[in-house]
Amino acid sequence: MTASLKRLPEADRPRERLLRLGPEKLTDVELLAILLGTGSRGRSVIEVARDLLHHCEAKDPGGGLRALLHLRDVDKKELVKGLGPAKVCTILAGLHLGLRAAAAPIRQVELSNPRA
């Protein structure tokens, strides 16, 4: 993988793919890459995201994305090259927003007009 997403055709970049196809069509790596925003020197954001998922899978086989919820145990060292505490916080915030959205009660709308 190249060190920069700028070398990819624009249509193949995760953010552009999300806008064009919707989030359900992106891989877990692509969605994580969007949250991370940038890679690190010599490593693309896709590589960092892929390494993070592999790291979590190694620690919790079968855990997949759910294993990311346990990233809070990170201290000042990097879990994977290019992923420090600030990016871990971004991932945790995104995951917990998703959990809250999934757990939020669905409001029922009362329709008084059958044509509404």
Task: Report each predicted region and the residues it spans.
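Long, highly charged, low-complexity intrinsically disordered interaction regions
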Residues: M1-V80
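Structured, non-catalytic alpha/beta "coupling" segments that mediate domain-domain communication
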Residues: K87-G98
